[in-house]
């Protein structure tokens, strides 16, 4: 969750082929070495953006050689605005006449051979709902009711937002849990219950006291239950995201974003970190504290790898003497726009072999899921990126709003719902998520 809240508070590159050059052998000291030169102007030698076989253009656009060489002069102007940063397609490349076609593309294809199965025969991106122009989080599909739950990060806002997928077109409503859940940012469905990570903290909101932590919500009865709300007496700062392993242990991130999002009255008491919680025994153990702002978390399909997103490019003021806390400050040059992979120890009690796998091409990677094939799917800026498990980009989905979190939905989990700042989109394609 890399949040944007001001409106809510008012309401409460392609490659050109180089020309072949024959290198001249050194037959004498005077023989010059002929080095090929990168062309700086003129018409492109290759087409940077083109149609993808079997798909309509420019809705689906293939980018030559990952866009690694742009002809002539080009510039991507940095826009360090939280929730509205610069994008790949905002790059100005006047010597690449096809680059502007990306403005009208729904899908950018980096790897054409992999994209065919990812996109399926008839991919679509549909803008479904216009919502408040602030952060929305914690999307999760409930197969027992065929609904998609998500939350709004607005000071004092307690209902859950629910999309009813039984209706055509789907409809959006509010449901208030008992007791309410405040500012959920991560969610999973297991064994009939929603497991929610929350960043909301307040001593007297609607007659309740809220603390960041882990909670369950029964979507049938609307009843909630607290699972975890402290680390040996310390409040958590902002329990942001979670996943549940095949043994039932809950792994979750805790960052500094609750107070600058204006949904937590307390400044951080402990450092940002990632934890493992055993709901059977109550034991909570830190497993990593190396990320600036640990955010999204997901397991690989075989549960042997954990992927974490670091959104430390969005920094928070943690000084309790500064009140109210300023909003999160985003800067693209700050470390923390990265997805990391870790091996899960055989004991399933620790994380090993941390390595970076992806530096976001837009904004910072926030919510993250894995597909059945093991692809990484992450909310990044104005869209969603699909990566190999080693971080190679395959496909990017473009949206008209900043996406903060995502969830697979539908009976076959072949729809991806993207939730974010001001909008909700549905992506229908060939990629499928896990049933768990």
UniProtKB/Swiss-Prot annotation:
Signal peptide extent: 1-27
GO terms of molecular function: hydrolase activity
Top enzyme class: hydrolase
Pfam families, A to Z: SGL (PF08450)
Tagged with keyword Membrane: no
Keyword check for Transmembrane helix: no
EC number per UniProt: 3.1.1.-
Transmembrane segments: none
Family matches, as SUPFAM superfamilies: Calcium-dependent phosphotriesterase (SSF63829)
Domain of life: Eukaryota
Biological pathway: Secondary metabolite biosynthesis
InterPro entries xref list: 6-blade_b-propeller_TolB-like, Oryzine_lactonohydrolase, SGL
Keywords of the record: Hydrolase, Signal
Family assignment from sequence similarity: Belongs to the SMP-30/CGR1 family.
Biological role: Lactonohydrolase; part of the gene cluster that mediates the biosynthesis of oryzines, natural products with an unusual maleidride backbone. The two subunits of the fungal fatty acid synthase oryfasA and oryfasB probably form octenoic acid. This fatty acid is most likely activated by the acyl-CoA ligase oryP to give octenyl-CoA before the citrate synthase-like protein oryE catalyzes condensation with oxaloacetate to form tricarboxylic acid.
Name the record gives this protein: Lactonohydrolase oryL
